[in-house]
Amino acid sequence: MDRSRLGRHGRRVGLGVLGLLLLIQLVPYGWSHPNPPVTQDAPWPDAESARIARDSCYACHSNETDWPAYSYVAPMSWAVRYDVEAGRAKLNFSTWDQDDGEADDAAETVREGSMPLDRYTVIHRGARLSDAEADRLVAALEALDRADGGGDDGDDGRDGGEDGDD
């Protein structure tokens, strides 16, 4: 192919991609950005733990999501909406009165370094956790779990129910 044909072909591909990007804006998923009411915020053990959670977790794990501008433009809007819906379904700090005891799982996920998601912290650098912040958040999540009746219940790992009268 000569240079002029390549140029025309490249322009056509570029216009096709641009047209597709404009067309996908018509797909309604991701347009709506609901923030349901907060029924009960998590009772964080201290203000610093609450700040760390708000900075690193609340965008996806609360009903207080601050929807960024890119969350209104497809295909990013689809990914953002999906992440928030999935995050709220797994653990929602804004509906603590309806908590299903997921704080211990969240502590483990933070301890492993799986949360916050890398794709989130690339864009939101303030959500990155230092080692000290991660340790503090894990301790706070474990405290929330214990306060909700989870966590260490005195079980030493042996099967219960034995009374020694056998």
Question: What residue ranges belong to the model's regions?
Answer:
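C-terminal capping alpha-helices of c-type cytochrome domains
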Residues: 113-114, 121-151
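The canonical Cys-X-X-Cys-His
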Residues: 53-64, 115, 137
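Hydrophobic membrane-insertion alpha-helices, especially the h-region
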Residues: 11-28
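Long, acidic low-complexity intrinsically disordered regions
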Residues: 151-166
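Short, Lys/Arg-rich N-terminal segment immediately upstream of the first membrane anchor
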Residues: 1-9
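Extracytoplasmic electron-transfer domains, predominantly the class I c-type cytochrome c fold
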Residues: 78-124
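Electrostatic cytochrome c docking/interface patches
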Residues: 33-53
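Short cysteine/histidine-rich zinc-coordinating motifs and their immediately flanking basic loops
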Residues: 69-75
